[in-house]
Structures are given as C-alpha cells and as structure tokens.
Swiss-Prot record:
Transmembrane segments: none annotated. The gene is STH. This is Saitohin. The keyword Nucleus applies. Residues 77-128 are annotated as: Disordered. It comes from Pan troglodytes (Chimpanzee). GO terms for cellular component: cytoplasm; nucleus. Residues 77-87 have a biased composition (Polar residues).
Length: 128
C-alpha cells in the first residue's frame, strides 16, 4: 500500500523496519522522511559524543598521538573530575533509556498530526 509516494505499513506488521526505533512505534509516532533524517542525525551526534568520552586518547599525551605542541587532548566534557563522573553517569543513562530520551522533536507538520485510532495505526517507513 502506498500513500504520498512513500511506503506505508501497519505499525505492528514490521516494527523493527521503521527507522529501527520500535519504541517510537509504541507511541504512535508518524515517521516521515525529515523526521527519520533528524533521528539519524541525533543518533550519530550521540554516538560521536559517547565515543569521545571513552576514547583512549584521554590517557595519551599529545606526543604519543603525534600532536606535539598541541597540548593534551581533552573533550570539553572532561574539564574537571566532577564533569568526568557526570559524563560517565550520563553515558549509563543513555544506554538504558535510549538515544532520543529528552530530545525535542523538530518542528514538522508530522509531529502535530493526531495519533491514529486504535487498530488503524500506520506509519511511513523510511529505509536507513
């Protein structure tokens, strides 16, 4: 079945194929291409941020990584010991609650659509 040029599938028919975020399906979110792209960008940003926090560069001096004269490499989140603990806690929280916890959806008409009635749930799937 197609609608507006995109493929539409029942929410419960293939939950893992809708942008690979089944949790959103449970909330009845209508996924459009711009919304999917935004979700992908948020996931990439979070992944890069978390990768920085656990990178082995944190324990290396600048000379060991070929950056003589630059100084020690520290991500901004590690400016103090307290921030280090907070960053570690945040990393654990993200892994438990998912990458979109606390994120605001972009302003998009799809976000303002009413939720479908029970038994009529549909969402536009986008291939990632």
């Amino acid at each position: 079945m197609s609608e507006g040029g995109g493929r539409v599938s029942r929410i419960f028919a293939a939950p893992t194929r809708l942008c690979r975020w089944p949790a959103l399906i449970e909330c009845g979110v209508n996924l459009t291409q711009p919304l999917c792209e935004w979700m992908i960008q948020v996931a990439r940003d979070r992944t890069l941020s978390l990768a920085w926090e656990v990178a082995s560069l944190l324990t290396l001096s600048s000379s060991e990584v070929g950056l003589e004269g630059v100084g020690t490499i520290w991500p901004s989140s590690y400016s103090s010991e307290e921030n280090s603990r907070n960053g570690a806690e945040q990393g654990r929280q993200l892994s438990i609650e998912g990458p979109f916890q606390g994120q605001n959806c972009p302003s998009h008409p799809a976000a303002a659509l009413p939720l479908p009635m029970r038994g009529e749930s549909q969402a536009t799937s986008c291939q990632v």
